[in-house]
Amino acid sequence: MKFRLLAIAGLAILLGACASQPRPLQGEFAAITPREAVDRDSTGAAVRWGGRIIRVEPHENRTCFEMISTRLDVYGRPYWASDDTGGRFIACRLGFYDPALFQPNREVSFTGRIDGYENRRIGQYDYRFPHVAADVVYLWPVRERVNVITRPPPWPWWGWW
């Protein structure tokens, strides 16, 4: 009896360990959105933000990502919701990140600190972007859409059994 309880508890712990955030995205971060960071000066705040790539700009020694922010799920992955945005932000990290891999609309999560603000134009609108000095750039795998087609069994009777 004790062995059975111990086995069940061990299995629960092992399965619980599988359902966690990727290690680079773990930690304590300020619960603010990019829009809130612009409204009040949040320079120096540690954040974990994510969303979809709008543009990737490789520079001489760093790469900057212009992002549209979305909420993150419990794993730190951005939700894919067209109207659920928290504003826009720019995240920069030392090194080269290939724009062919980091294409527009790919999902990325960042951790880092807000190190300032930058004004850019979106069309004719002057937009103030929070600027994040990223410690982690986490590119998520592409979500695959799977169409599940259910068919009746090979006999004519339908039922709950």
Where are these regions (language model features)?
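Sec-dependent bacterial lipoprotein signal peptides
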Residues: 1-18
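OB-fold and OB-like single-stranded nucleic-acid-recognition modules
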Residues: 18-161
